[in-house]
């Protein structure tokens, strides 16, 4: 599956956050959270300082919101994590990041650079341990989202969904079950499944990607859109309809 390295996904997300902010401020927030006073305020956050995209402030009370946007929820995925800092927490990922840096320094032809990065990516995914995977998921996905309200917007229909991340099956599995990488046809990505104490296999639609943030062209200096590119770890949510169905009564439309 192709993914954007030109900044268009980020720009689209910013537009969605602005529209969602206005929608919540005009009354949707009080419908979701009836205890809010008349003086509540929806504040734009995001950037490098905040995990939450939006924040509802009402006196001493705060509601943290992670906003996810899809044109069609039946197509594509959204990110739980897109981080270069997480690369430091596994020897396999460190080696991938070092390979990316080396390719950037030597600036070989595009195809040579792409092949080197893809090979390093596949090796990293194939060799990361279950222990490292669980540690990264706990630190960078569960902990950073456990107090978050997740809001999914489908722009083609105008539908919105809201749920608490700490009530989700994914959060429960990250905290209590064993994650495993399932290698398939993808070179730089794989599914992440979980096993419980009874050896039941649980699929929450989680995918891991080990890639560069701005693509190969930026890495070797041939891109006009970006001048640098580094190794990043992504966890993505596939199969959004299944996610919504699995939450059952814990998710609501607004």
Which residues make up each language-model segment?
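A short acidic/basic microdomain associated with nuclease active sites
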Residues: 26-59
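Protruding loop/beta-arch "assembly-hinge" segments enriched in small, turn-prone residues
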Residues: 225-254
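Catalytic cores of nucleic-acid endonucleases
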Residues: 3-11, 18, 26-28, 60-225, ...
């Amino acid at each position: 599956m192709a993914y954007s390295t030109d900044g268009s996904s980020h720009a689209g997300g910013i537009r969605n956050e602005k529209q969602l902010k206005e929608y919540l401020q005009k009354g949707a927030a009080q419908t979701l959270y009836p205890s809010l006073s008349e003086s509540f305020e929806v504040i734009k956050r995001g950037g490098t300082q905040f995990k939450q995209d939006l924040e509802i402030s009402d006196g001493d009370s705060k509601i943290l919101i992670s906003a996810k946007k899809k044109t069609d929820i039946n197509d594509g995925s959204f990110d739980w994590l897109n981080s270069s800092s997480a690369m430091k927490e596994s020897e396999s990922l460190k080696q991938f990041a070092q390979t990316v840096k080396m390719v950037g320094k030597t600036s070989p032809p595009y195809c040579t650079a792409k092949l080197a990065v893809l090979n390093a990516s596949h090796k990293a995914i194939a060799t990361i341990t279950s222990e490292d995977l669980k540690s990264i998921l706990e630190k960078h996905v569960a902990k950073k989202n456990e107090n978050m309200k997740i809001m999914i917007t489908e722009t083609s229909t105008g539908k919105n969904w809201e749920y608490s991340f700490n009530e989700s099956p994914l959060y429960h599995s990250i905290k209590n079950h064993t994650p495993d990488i399932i290698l398939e046809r993808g070179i730089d990505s794989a599914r992440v499944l979980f096993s419980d104490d009874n050896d039941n296999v649980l699929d929450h639609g989680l995918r891991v990607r080990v890639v560069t943030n701005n693509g190969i062209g930026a890495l070797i200096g041939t891109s006009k859109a970006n001048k640098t590119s580094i190794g990043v770890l992504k966890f993505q949510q596939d199969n959004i309809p299944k996610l919504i169905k699995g939450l059952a009564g814990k998710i609501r439309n607004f």
